[in-house]
Amino acid sequence: MELVVEPLNLHLNAETGSTLLDVLRSNEVPISYSCMSGRCGTCRCRVIAGHLRDNGPETGRPQAGKGAYVLACQAVLTEDCTIEIPESDEIVVHPARIVKGTVTAIDEATHDIRRLRIKLAKPLEFSPGQYATVQFTPECVRPYSMAGLPSDAEMEFQIRAVPGGHVSNYVFNELSVGASVRISGPLGTAYLRRTHTGPMLCVGGGTGLAPVLSIVRGALESGMSYPIHLYFGVRSEQDIYDEERLHALAARFPNLKVNVVVATGPAGPGHRSGLVTDLIGRDLPNLAGWRLHPVWRSGHGRGPEPARCSPRHSTRAHPCRCVLSQRRLSEGTMRTQFNPRIPSHE
């Protein structure tokens, strides 16, 4: 049978029963993938014509047809098919692994946010903006975005206290320096596109600052010189953290503009009052033609929830973060499963 891959206009021979990812990899077609078990959502692609058998963990229909999004590692070929994959400048392949680590610091960032630092036994490569699952105990496992870069001496996660949250309660009240943890990843498609040339808009609220900080640092330290507009939104002055780090970056890199926005109560010196989305609308009234990277918000469930970028979305009820950069429009999602099957153990 034939598999057509757009926008590359490739015509590939394939065997019935093969997964899309197997066929793409065997033909050296560039596509991002990570866990290879249908959990991370990295190998997402779209069906243009034909049907596939979808074995994904969340699928509600075994046959996926025109317009459906599937995971290449879980979609099985049953007939001639045409698919669309992300453009090659968005490809990243960091095979997911399990790496042991040791907690080296648990710092109080705010009254309800802890900054967790972990020293890994072995390096873990990831792209800025990706996330990993952290296993504190067999019963305490959650996904968190990396706040740093793979070149950092330690891995950093920012964890917010969730009322009634089993894992955050453990982190705040039981976890101690010296504890052993397991890091599974990297996962996710909301990573920095390094080949992009154009301005970026980055928005983070609460612990949504973590992946935004990773992306902004990755962009700046790799030499990207176009304007980067960073908006950090909080409910009140007591929720602000990492401000010194943000302004230190802005002092080093003049193309970075930092806005700290306080939604309720008086704003302190150098801060702005109101909703982040309203201020963005006034500061940047025309975002036509800007490129949209995956957008998500931190919910109170098991993991990141997909979210749409809209003027009134999620600034108060949920921390949110988004990254936009000028040019084309693309869209991605992050999976909500918190315990992916990772093939290798270290």
Curated annotation (Swiss-Prot):
Family from the record: Belongs to the bacterial ring-hydroxylating dioxygenase ferredoxin reductase component family.
Domain (2Fe-2S ferredoxin-type) ranges: 1-89
Enzyme class: oxidoreductase
Origin species: Burkholderia sp. (strain RASC)
Assembly description: The 2,4-dinitrotoluene dioxygenase (DNTDO) multicomponent enzyme system is composed of an electron transfer component and a dioxygenase component (iron sulfur protein (ISP)). The electron transfer component is composed of a ferredoxin reductase (DntAa) and a ferredoxin (DntAb), and the dioxygenase component is formed of a large alpha subunit (DntAc) and a small beta subunit (DntAd).
Limits of the FAD-binding FR-type domain: 96-193
A GO molecular-function descriptor: ferredoxin-NAD+ reductase activity
UniProt key word Iron-sulfur: yes
Annotated positions binding [2Fe-2S] cluster: C35, C40, C43, C73
Protein name as it appears in the record: 2,4-dinitrotoluene dioxygenase system ferredoxin--NAD(+), reductase component
UniProt KW keywords: 2Fe-2S, Aromatic hydrocarbons catabolism, FAD, Flavoprotein, Iron, Iron-sulfur, Metal-binding, NAD, Oxidoreductase
Xref: InterPro entries: 2Fe-2S_ferredoxin-like_sf, 2Fe-2S_ferredoxin-type, 2Fe2S_fd_BS, Beta-grasp_dom_sf, Cbr1-like_FAD-bd_dom, FAD-bd_FR_type, FNR_nucleotide-bd, MRET
UniProt lineage: Bacteria, Pseudomonadati, Pseudomonadota, Betaproteobacteria, Burkholderiales
Pfam families for the chain: FAD_binding_6 (PF00970), Fer2 (PF00111), NAD_binding_1 (PF00175)
